[in-house]
Amino acid sequence: MTRFLFALILGFLLTACQQVTVDETEFVPKKLTELRVGTLYGPQIYMTSGQGDSGFDYDMAVLFAEYLDVPLKMVPYTNRTELYEALKKNEIDLIAAGMTETPARREQFRLGPPLYRVNQVLVYREGMPAPKDISDLKGKITVIADSSFVETLTQLQKHYPTLVWDQITDKDSEELLAMIANKEIDYTIADSSSVQINRRYLPDLRSGPVLEEKLDVVWLLPPTRSDELMSQLLAFWHQEKLAGTLDHLNEKYFGHVKRFDYVDTRAFIRAIETVLPRYRQLFETHAGNLDWRKLAATSYQESHWNPHARSATGVRGMMMLTQPTAKEIGITNRLDAEESIRGGAAYLNDMINRLPESIPESQRMWFALASYNIGYAHVEDARKLAESMELNPNAWRDLKKVLPLLQKRKYYQKTRYGYARGSEAVHYVDSIRRYYDTLVWVDNQSKQQNPEEEPSDLASEEPAIPAGTLSPEQPK
């Protein structure tokens, strides 16, 4: 009996110590040699243009690839079904496509940390009766198949049994919003951020009742073999959150689109079609190092592209220059469109060059525009004030908070240059950013319709007035 027990125990120990052969490829993930990111096209997700790639998800993906020290490969898909299948088949490493957290996605995938929040809203067009709720509709809802909107409608149908909708697979969210504006469909559902961005180009869009509130936008990872990537993503997310990157990207893509003026947006789109062609070449010629569309957007904010514009304060012309500024940069006739554009471009380029190198390239234009509006000295006051409040003086998102304080005695009495209408400067910059985004969209649409047209190189042919010739204390 003793020998039998000994043999049994020995056999068990030998078995326990024996190396088990497994297919390691099934359990151990291969080291990434590149980060393959599946995505969808959209202005807040991923877009390509002559000015480079952009989008909240794209910018974060670039940073994540840098964090992992591997090349980034963006892999766009035309619909969600293909995107999901690609992730399940290990053709991509993750999905970064502006997708919200939903019960169905939690069951199928691993969800990354929250990037930002959105509401789901019912969308209709200007001129239709405003629906009070989902049961008060005068037409049919059309949504994208396999989207979170289908999940929302399915839940609502439990309370509204007569609720029906159409699902389509060959369109994306942007196309459905365009179909609303063009009266091709009655209603759709969209994320609030998408509506805010797209109504700059489609001003007839209207947001109706909120169907789901404060949904987290997340990245999707495979349900298995993604432990290492998830841990790296969480560490990266914590790093970027502490660094203020998420706040910066939220401000970059969404901070200037919340304010919306229906009449102004329609008027701007008409002006792009009817007025801008007369002056486009001048903007391209004199932009210098600027994107000519930013210069044109600034001019529209200043004068609505009216070369004879005047104000009660004495500023005049396409770029609304003051007499001292015009004299200093050699502009003799502020009401001459070309002279005014040349002078305004010179001033803006000068402001950009004067800014401290610590301000990131992507944000220098917004600081320069604020200087163009209220003067460089007041912007410097605001930067110092931001620093004293433990905010980042080199981040536009923080300067936006501080500039309005220059109107309050409690704060401006501590500054070198005193009172300034800082809230006006914030509104000024945000308006130009909205005009610029709209102009870029219209310009890109035109290039798609006329691909044989080459972009103009005139901007590089005639240099702007040399930088460093303007007084930093004065606004334009």
Curated annotation (Swiss-Prot):
> What is the recorded membrane topology of this protein?
Peripheral membrane protein
Disulfide-bond pairs as recorded: none
Principal location class:
membrane
InterPro entries tied to this protein? Lysozyme-like_dom_sf, MltF, Solute-binding_3/MltF_N, Transglycosylase_SLT_dom_1
Which GO terms fall under biological process for this protein?
Answer: cell wall macromolecule catabolic process; cell wall organization; peptidoglycan catabolic process
The molecular function terms of the Gene Ontology recorded here are:
peptidoglycan lytic transglycosylase activity
The ranges of region (LT domain) come to 258-476
Recorded superkingdom: Bacteria
Q: Give the enzyme class.
A: lyase
Q: Where is this region: Non-LT domain?
A: 23-257
Q: Where is the active site?
A: E302
Residues of the region (Disordered) are 446-476
Task: List compositional bias (Acidic residues) regions by residue number.
Answer: 451-460
Catalytic activity reported: Exolytic cleavage of the (1->4)-beta-glycosidic linkage between N-acetylmuramic acid (MurNAc) and N-acetylglucosamine (GlcNAc) residues in peptidoglycan, from either the reducing or the non-reducing ends of the peptidoglycan chains, with concomitant formation of a 1,6-anhydrobond in the MurNAc residue
Subcellular location(s): the record lists:
Cell outer membrane
Gene Ontology cellular-component terms listed: cell outer membrane
Q: Which UniProt keywords apply?
A: Cell outer membrane, Cell wall biogenesis/degradation, Lyase, Membrane, Signal
- Residues annotated as signal peptide: 1-22
Similarity comment: family membership: In the N-terminal section; belongs to the bacterial solute-binding protein 3 family. In the C-terminal section; belongs to the transglycosylase Slt family.
| Comment block on domains | The N-terminal domain does not have lytic activity and probably modulates enzymatic activity. The C-terminal domain is the catalytic active domain.
The record ties this protein, via HAMAP family, to: MltF (MF_02016)
Which PANTHER family does the record cross-reference, listed alphabetically?
MEMBRANE-BOUND LYTIC MUREIN TRANSGLYCOSYLASE F
Q: What does this protein do?
A: Murein-degrading enzyme that degrades murein glycan strands and insoluble, high-molecular weight murein sacculi, with the concomitant formation of a 1,6-anhydromuramoyl product. Lytic transglycosylases (LTs) play an integral role in the metabolism of the peptidoglycan (PG) sacculus. Their lytic action creates space within the PG sacculus to allow for its expansion as well as for the insertion of various structures such as secretion systems and flagella.
Name assigned to this protein: Membrane-bound lytic murein transglycosylase F
This chain's source organism reads: Shewanella baltica (strain OS155 / ATCC BAA-1091)
Q: What is the lineage of its organism?
A: Bacteria, Pseudomonadati, Pseudomonadota, Gammaproteobacteria, Alteromonadales
